[in-house]
Amino acid sequence: AAADEGTPIYIYAATNPENDICSLDSLTKAGISAYIGNGNKRNYRNMARYVRQHIDAKRLFVTPAEEAVESASDVLYHLDEDLSFKTVADYEKYLREQGIYREKAPKIAIVGGLNDPFSGNRANIDSLIVSLQNAGMNVYPVSSYRQRLTFLREIGPDAVIHFAHGRMVMGQADAAVEWLKKRNIPIFSPLSMLETQEEWESDPMGMFGGFMSQSIVVPELDGAIY
């Protein structure tokens, strides 16, 4: 109904043909897709500016939008969301320069498919990094889909924390399990909630459907500890 009345609509990553709706022209759709597809605070900010100028057609007090920038992938990261590291060596060099690295301290790797560290919504990740560092550990947060197992092998962690949404290493699940067995280390899988703790605890169901299977059932195949 809104589209019929002329309201610009674009449903990104539609789940089925019935809700695959777009009333934008191809150039505008491509621009919006570039911002969303590389979700980070800079791109979201510029998407809002783009919408205001090119879709809402505002003319006064307009700040032109910058081009979308590609989000980092297959990298290690830390508390500064503007920094990322392509190699473990570069990451450890950074930790040493910051006076954070501890020689011979336990190594904790953090991986996950549900938490994007570059999206601007990462308070839970940052608090975990700081807490583990304050406990005397070296923390290795990894943002990677294709190279996750490669990073883990190079890091050689004493434990893995997996913010699960599926298997720890998609496409290499059996190899990942064998690697865990060989190293004989635990994999912890804290639950990521899309609501407040109070709302979750008061909900009799707690989790449901695909979210439950991807966060609890499937990770158990990797030996996840909750």
At which residue positions do the language-model features occur?
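An N-terminal assembly and electron-transfer interface module characteristic of large anaerobic redox
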Residues: A1-Y226
